[in-house]
Curated annotation (Swiss-Prot):
<keyword id="KW-0812">Transmembrane</keyword>
<feature type="region of interest" description="Disordered">
    <location>
        <begin position="229"/>
        <end position="256"/>
    </location>
</feature>
<dbReference type="Pfam" id="PF14946">
    <property type="entry name" value="DUF4501"/>
</dbReference>
<feature type="glycosylation site" description="N-linked (GlcNAc...) asparagine">
    <location>
        <position position="104"/>
    </location>
</feature>
<feature type="region of interest" description="Disordered">
    <location>
        <begin position="336"/>
        <end position="380"/>
    </location>
</feature>
<keyword id="KW-0472">Membrane</keyword>
<keyword id="KW-0325">Glycoprotein</keyword>
<feature type="signal peptide">
    <location>
        <begin position="1"/>
        <end position="18"/>
    </location>
</feature>
<feature type="transmembrane region" description="Helical">
    <location>
        <begin position="148"/>
        <end position="168"/>
    </location>
</feature>
<dbReference type="InterPro" id="IPR027888">
    <property type="entry name" value="DUF4501"/>
</dbReference>
<feature type="compositionally biased region" description="Basic and acidic residues">
    <location>
        <begin position="356"/>
        <end position="366"/>
    </location>
</feature>
<dbReference type="GO" id="GO:0016020">
    <property type="term" value="C:membrane"/>
</dbReference>
<feature type="glycosylation site" description="N-linked (GlcNAc...) asparagine">
    <location>
        <position position="111"/>
    </location>
</feature>
<keyword id="KW-1133">Transmembrane helix</keyword>
<feature type="compositionally biased region" description="Pro residues">
    <location>
        <begin position="240"/>
        <end position="249"/>
    </location>
</feature>
<feature type="glycosylation site" description="N-linked (GlcNAc...) asparagine">
    <location>
        <position position="128"/>
    </location>
</feature>
<keyword id="KW-0732">Signal</keyword>
Length: 380
């Protein structure tokens, strides 16, 4: 964009320079023609005398302004055709020519340096077309052209650089807050908006990771993760209710999976008391039948004697149901763990949105945490 403006300014400069040169050449040619015509003019009756014409051409350089010292109207100049600026040539009755200053019975012209007079019959009236010496261009023309070009160049360059610098600083976030609009959310690409929104729950089997209820320290820790089909979001803080009394028999058969969190011990070492230095074993898993729910009852009985360092993490695979209200329904679910040999649940791929529709209310906060709520994604 800057190169385009520079090319435009260069073309403008060339045009102005060519125009001024053309005007200068035209003025010089006109002045030379007028000078030659005035030098060849002669009063009536003396046009055939070559002596007068030769004498006028010879004394052209000697008397450039012959009417400067002429006071009277009838005063005559040696070279009648060499009247300077501010004077005019007047033919007398005897055939002689006189250079008379403007103001002695004459009418002022347009610029004040020329004058008009009532010349004799048949005598051409020479008018001085320039305020200076005939044949010379005006001394201020090149300066005006140069000043015009330089002024246009510097003004346009300053505007272009200022606009480019403003947008560069705004892009790099180096401007003060007053230069940014607060009532508009930043423009998010569809991929960015889709990445900020959590994926929906799959329609098949889903994983429910629940801390052990027998250990209060796990429920109070910051790392406790509550993800269940009832809530759908981690960290919601809603805990599933405790199962009923220990005497209530289970109503369904099923299987679950226990994952030992490293460092962990064998199940026989946790109760009644853990050893002083537990061995380091890899993460293992084991299947257990749901009717033998030793975990819930034993943790209620022995949670005071258990060491919080050796905690178990129970991961159950169940079908999402609206009436499933806690850990009891998860343990008694008739759906088995899918992908038991792979070591983890399998989730369905998340469908990407086709387009993103953003709403821009006037009172919108600039907090980055509010960005996911500002984008509305539709899969229609």
């Amino acid at each position: 964009m800057a190169l385009r403006h520079l090319a435009l300014l260069a073309g403008l400069l060339v045009g102005v320079a060519s125009k001024s040169m053309e005007n200068t050449v035209t003025r010089n040619s006109t002045a030379v023609i007028n000078t030659q015509a005035e030098g060849t003019l002669s009063p009536p009756g003396l046009s055939s005398l070559p002596v007068v014409r030769e004498w006028a051409l010879t004394h052209t350089a000697q008397l450039p302004e012959c009417c400067v010292d002429v006071v009277g109207v009838n005063a005559s100049c040696p070279g009648a055709s060499l009247c300077g600026p501010g004077c005019y040539r007047r033919w007398n009755a005897d055939g002689s020519a006189s250079c008379v200053r403007c103001g002695n019975g004459t009418l002022p012209a347009y610029n004040g340096s020329e004058c008009r007079s009532f010349a004799g019959p048949g005598a051409p009236f020479p008018m001085n077309r320039s305020s200076g010496t005939p044949g010379r261009p005006h001394p201020g023309a090149p300066r005006v052209a140069a000043s015009l070009f330089l002024g246009t160049f510097f003004i346009s360059s300053g505007l272009i650089l200022s606009v480019a610098g403003f947008f560069y600083l705004k892009r790099s976030s180096k401007l003060p807050r007053a230069c940014y609009r607060r009532n508009k959310a930043p423009a998010l690409q569809p991929g960015e908006a889709a990445a900020m929104i959590p994926p929906p729950q799959s329609s098949g089997n889903s994983s429910c990771r629940i801390p052990l209820w027998g250990f209060p320290s796990l429920g109070q820790s910051q790392g406790a993760l509550w993800v269940c089909p009832q809530t759908g979001l981690p960290g919601s803080g809603s805990r599933p209710p405790l199962p009923g009394s220990p005497g209530d028999p289970p109503t369904r058969q099923g299987q679950g999976r226990i994952w030992l969190v490293p460092p962990a011990l064998d199940l026989s070492w946790i109760w009644p008391a853990p050893p002083a230095r537990p061995p380091l074993i890899p993460v293992t898993s084991m299947l257990f039948p749901v009717p033998e729910t030793w975990g819930l009852q034993e943790r209620r009985t022995h949670h005071d004697r258990a060491d919080p360092q050796y905690l178990l993490l129970l991961e159950v695979q169940l079908h999402p149901r609206t009436d499933a209200a806690g850990l009891r329904q998860a343990l008694l679910s008739s759906h088995r763990f899918s992908g038991a040999g792979s070591g983890g649940p399998k989730s369905q791929p998340v469908r990407k949105p086709r387009y993103v529709r953003r709403e821009r209310p006037l009172d919108r906060a600039t907090d980055p945490a509010a960005f996911p709520g500002e984008a509305r994604i539709s899969n229609v």
